[in-house]
């Protein structure tokens, strides 16, 4: 043994003290969190898997495997969590339980602002149901924007025209004609009336064994639709946390409901409107499934699809392969680049 390399105990302790002083607050928090985790494991606390159904800052409501709701605090080293996240949580003997880990997400529902910042809204969906009210008259551009946003998220989308009881027979026929192009593109379209209980069974079938979100502008009847599919006791569960004053969520917090018939439904005020940000042109082509096949067929690479010669999109409109309203929506979003 080389005695010169042996560090005296007091000197070693002094070095540890100096190193500890050099630790940043963030580093110390990480160490403390890891120590707490080890302490919990040492005490034999059980690791549980759960589903985040609502979030309130430092707290979250977790749906357990036996369909109980547990209020948890969030481990500091976790990323921002959203409704639909699958997580690992641990029960505490004293105080609130704690969320300790995030299970990798299968999909993300998000929007992008003009600062190109990604705003995560929900996780692990496999379909989005875009709800449009027929009165007042819906906008094709708004609908196309929602469809483009879902394509950007790589989510299957379907369209619901709600409140059709407000239309007379002539207006209903016009609606069917306007919606026809979306069916031709490949989107599933449903016509609903909660008052007449019309069209609900067909949509209910689509909710089975899926994780779905109702998306659409305010005032289109999403809340009324949710009541048609969500058991009353589940809605009550979503209101539990109001009594704790840990988060008033009537207008600001997303909620997840488990359907009695199977499947999960997400309702969120945060998905009333979507921004696509400044999408690159190639990204925008990807968001319009009917226009995407023509993206490399124009004569000019920077074609604006107006009056340029040999514009593939204008030619497709003339031959009826693309609707003029869809092209106009595409160009309007393209102008926002």
Q: Predicted segment positions?
A:
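Phosphate-binding glycine-rich loops and their immediate beta-loop-alpha structural context
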Residues: 121-124, 133-186
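Helix-rich effector regions associated with P-loop NTPase G domains
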Residues: 2-17, 46, 81-95, 103-127, ...
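C-terminal effector/interaction modules appended to NTPase cores
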Residues: 2-151
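Catalytic P-loop NTPase motifs of RecA-like helicase/translocase cores
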Residues: 138, 167, 198, 272-275
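Canonical P-loop GTPase G-domain recognition
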Residues: 166-220
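A conserved segment at the C-terminal end of the G1
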Residues: 223-235
């Amino acid at each position: 043994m080389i005695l010169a390399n042996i560090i005296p105990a007091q000197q070693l302790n002094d070095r540890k003290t100096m190193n500890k002083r050099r630790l940043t607050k963030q580093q110390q928090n990480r160490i403390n969190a890891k120590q707490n985790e080890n302490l919990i494991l040492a005490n034999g606390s059980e690791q549980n898997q759960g589903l985040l159904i609502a979030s309130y800052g430092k707290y979250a409501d977790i749906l357990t495997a036996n369909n109980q709701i547990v209020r948890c605090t969030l481990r500091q080293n976790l990323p921002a969590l959203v409704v639909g996240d699958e997580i690992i949580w641990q029960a505490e003997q004293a105080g609130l339980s704690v969320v300790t880990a995030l299970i990798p997400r299968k999909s993300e529902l998000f929007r992008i602002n003009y600062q190109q910042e990604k705003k995560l809204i929900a996780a692990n969906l496999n379909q989005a149901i875009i709800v449009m009210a027929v009165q007042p008259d819906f906008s094709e551009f708004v609908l196309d924007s929602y469809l483009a946003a879902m394509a950007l998220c790589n989510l299957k989308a379907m369209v619901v025209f709600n409140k059709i009881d407000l239309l007379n027979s002539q207006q209903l026929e016009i609606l069917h004609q306007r919606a026809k192009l979306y069916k031709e593109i490949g989107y599933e379209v449903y016509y609903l009336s909660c008052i007449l209980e019309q069209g609900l069974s067909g949509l209910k079938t689509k909710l089975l064994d899926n994780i779905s979100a109702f998306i659409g502008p305010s005032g289109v009847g999403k809340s009324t639709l949710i009541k048609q599919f969500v058991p009353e006791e589940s809605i009550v569960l979503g209101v539990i946390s109001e009594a704790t004053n840990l988060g008033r969520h009537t207008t600001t917090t997303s909620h997840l409901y488990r359907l009695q018939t199977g499947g999960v439904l997400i309702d969120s005020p945060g998905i009333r409107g979507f921004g696509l940000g400044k999408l690159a042109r190639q990204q925008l082509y990807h968001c319009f499934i009917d226009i995407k096949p023509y993206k490399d067929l124009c004569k000019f690479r920077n074609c604006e699809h107006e009056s340029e010669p040999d514009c593939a999109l204008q030619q497709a409109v003339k031959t009826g392969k693309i609707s003029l309203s869809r092209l106009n929506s595409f160009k309007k979003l393209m102008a926002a680049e």
